[in-house]
Curated annotation (Swiss-Prot):
One of its GO terms (biological process) is shoot system development. Its main location: membrane. The chain crosses the membrane at residues 55-71. Residues 39-70 are annotated as: Required for DVL/RTFL small polypeptide activity. This is Small polypeptide DEVIL 8.
Amino acid sequence: MSRLRNSAQLQLSKKESLGDNGGALNTTRSSRQKQGKYGFTRKCGRLVKEQRARFYIMRRCVVMLICWTDHNNNNSDHS
């Protein structure tokens, strides 16, 4: 008896989460194809942004180390 109640509650919660019109079940084929294409574009864009940020950080670190090394070498020459 409790299993029937749980399954009925589970089915009710699924219907509630999808809404009255079925939600994602009414997605047309063309909109699914667009989502796939734009999803790929978004993923690529995100990866490009991430790699650009990593490259920027690495470049800043290298410049900082070069400047720090030059500064230390200049100070040791005078001592």
